[in-house]
């Protein structure tokens, strides 16, 4: 199984580009696991593969154990933000032993700095402490050394691997609302763009507020994406000049990697889709022929097929005059594409910190290994990534940078900066 995953990462993954040779060699450790399936063996195999994938710097690469508890792979019931010599607990949702502001001084007896000084730093996703993602190491830790914020006392705890999944909870009931902050400012928070009707409903209910506002503060700090349809209702309030939704979002076509492995999987997918949807034999054959003709040709440009209504120019609404967008590394997916679109609008200013930087590689493929595990990887690149101007690991930069400090444990500093602009 690992041989197949390694081959996919080297040849079929849209971000391969020779980077597979730079990944950690976990093969000797995988080989020691043996072939007999046991719960312990599977758990260790997942840990090794997840570490290998984390070192690519692309969170789109994932492996999932089928039939397991559908919690997020790296969930421990809290999140932590890295500083120079420790991790600060910045949110707790399912661990009553911890409080916001507590410090994590060591993981499995090793200081935080030790993880930055060897190959493990590649699994942190970020090049600066405030952008590091410690989820992998927290999830697989046996002990965490904690310093209490309130008392300064220290204790060791075992992470709660059965914690509720904050991401799943957020996806079930994503935060979405709009409210006035003062006579001239409206604040809108969107944590998901998946439900276009819900976004349209909030826009419709607050249309008057938005039109009268001098400034819209649009909070995308926790928005993991969703769909481009979820952006469309916002268009009249975000644009400077008349433009279609397609023009606003920019080129949404993709460079798809037609490797042999990808083409084999695409043909199998077409045959399955044909069977389920009742395609004619001619329709199926035409699509299979198209794929086979492109096999092993490398990256092939495929333009986006936009709905007709996305090509019709839209007039900007009378308000707001300015749009201030709140951003942090929790912003990902379609929300990052929205950020890039807003960078092209003169009325928009991005405040905070860079987004996650995980949207260069798209069009996810799923490989089923013996109905036991699923491996997920992207097979296409955005035009920007293909031209060497991607945002992977870097994110969309803020116009007004707000560095993370301990003050954010007590106050929403990014929002304060936005309101003062």
Which positions does each model-derived feature cover?
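Flexible, low-complexity junctional segments that flank or bridge functional domains
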Residues: 1-216, 220-251, 258-266, 322, ...
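Conserved acidic, small-residue-rich alpha-beta core segments centered on
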Residues: 228-409
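Juxtamembrane/interface motifs at transmembrane-helix termini
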Residues: 67, 397, 411-413
């Amino acid at each position: 199984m690992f041989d197949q995953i390694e081959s996919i990462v080297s040849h079929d993954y849209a971000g391969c580009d020779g980077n597979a040779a730079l990944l950690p060699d976990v093969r000797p450790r995988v080989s020691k696991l043996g072939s007999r399936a046991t719960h312990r063996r599977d758990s260790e195999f997942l840990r090794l593969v997840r570490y290998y994938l984390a070192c690519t710097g692309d969170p789109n690469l994932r492996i999932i154990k089928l039939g397991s508890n559908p919690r997020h792979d790296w969930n421990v019931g809290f999140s932590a933000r890295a500083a120079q010599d420790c991790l600060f607990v910045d949110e707790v949702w399912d661990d009553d032993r911890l409080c916001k502001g507590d410090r994590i001084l060591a993981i499995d007896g090793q200081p935080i700095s030790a993880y930055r000084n060897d190959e493990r730093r590649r699994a942190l996703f970020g090049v600066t402490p405030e952008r590091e993602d410690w989820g992998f190491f927290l999830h697989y830790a046996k002990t965490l050394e904690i310093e209490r914020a309130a008392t300064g006392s220290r204790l060791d705890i075992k992470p709660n691997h059965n914690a509720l999944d904050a991401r799943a909870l957020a996806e079930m009931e994503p935060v979405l609302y709009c409210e006035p902050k003062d006579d001239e400012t409206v604040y809108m928070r969107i944590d998901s763009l998946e439900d276009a009707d819900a976004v349209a409903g909030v826009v419709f209910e607050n249309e008057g507020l938005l039109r009268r506002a001098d400034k819209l503060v649009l909070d995308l700090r926790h928005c993991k994406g969703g769909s481009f349809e979820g952006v469309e209702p916002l268009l009249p309030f975000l644009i400077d000049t008349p433009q279609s939704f397609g023009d606003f979002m920019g080129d949404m076509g993709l460079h798809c990697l037609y490797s042999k492995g990808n083409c084999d999987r695409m043909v199998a997918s077409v045959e399955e889709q044909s069977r389920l949807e009742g395609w004619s034999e001619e329709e199926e054959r035409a699509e299979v022929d198209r794929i086979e003709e492109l096999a092993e040709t490398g990256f092939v440009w495929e333009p986006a097929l936009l709905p007709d209504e996305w090509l019709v120019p839209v007039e900007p609404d009378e308000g707001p005059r300015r749009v201030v967008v709140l951003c942090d590394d929790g912003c990902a997916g379609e929300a990052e594409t929205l950020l890039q679109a807003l960078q092209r609008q003169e009325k928009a200013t991005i405040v905070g910190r860079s987004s996650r930087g995980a949207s260069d590689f798209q069009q996810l493929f799923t490989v089923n290994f013996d109905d036991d595990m699923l491996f997920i990887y992207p097979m296409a690149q955005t035009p920007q990534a293909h031209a060497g101007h991607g945002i992977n690991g870097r994110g969309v930069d803020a116009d007004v940078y707000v560095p993370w400090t301990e003050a954010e444990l007590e106050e929403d500093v990014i929002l304060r900066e936005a309101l003062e602009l």
